[in-house]
UniProtKB/Swiss-Prot annotation:
Its EC number is 1.5.1.42. This is FMN reductase (NADH) RutF. It holds the Pfam family Flavin_Reduct. Keywords: Flavoprotein, FMN, NAD, Oxidoreductase. PANTHER family: FLAVIN REDUCTASE, FMN REDUCTASE (NADH) RUTF.
Length: 164
């Protein structure tokens, strides 16, 4: 069997563009958030998406206990916020850098997000170092900004909606 080494895998994955998201939670275990691009649709019946979270991440226990989350998809210009939530900055400083409102699950929704998906974690599957969080979507909030933000080739890229 041919096993692909970690660096080859990571280099190949850098060729797959993905939306940039800040995943947030709030509940009995506290408030937390992190930046993620490992997010995708699972099905529209019932509306479900998935988020991949490293079990070694400092935020993992908070998400594991709260069982709710909000996927906040960023728009162009929000790169500094992505970097803030992707680093070791204390949680209170991360959340102080933007305006938030509580979603139906109580999770923080970024007011200027391109779109926010307010979810309850319905199932968790462990694979390697990560948990795959299957998330039942309870509410969606869209913002009118025309610019998306993707992570591709290890850097940010702005996308604009077509005029037609």
């Amino acid at each position: 069997m041919n096993i692909v080494d970690q660096q080859t895998f990571r280099d190949a994955m850098s060729c797959m563009g993905a939306a940039v998201n800040i995943i947030t939670t709030d509940g009995p275990a506290g408030r937390a958030g992190f930046t993620a691009s490992a997010v995708c649709s699972v099905t529209d019946t019932p509306p479900t998406l998935l988020v991949c979270l490293n079990r070694g991440a400092s935020v993992w226990p908070v998400f594991n206990e709260n069982r709710t989350l909000c996927v906040n998809t960023l728009s162009a210009g929000q790169e500094p916020l992505s970097n803030l939530f992707g680093g070791k900055t204390p949680m209170e400083h991360r959340f102080a850098a933007a305006r938030w409102q509580n979603g139906v699950t109580g999770c923080p929704q970024l007011e200027e997000a391109l779109v926010s998906f307010d979810c309850r974690i319905s199932q968790v599957v462990s694979v390697g170092t990560h948990d795959i969080l299957f998330c039942a979507i309870e509410a969606i909030h869209r913002h009118a900004t025309p610019y998306g933000l993707v992570w591709f080739d290890r850097s940010y890229h702005a996308l604009m909606r077509p005029a037609c």
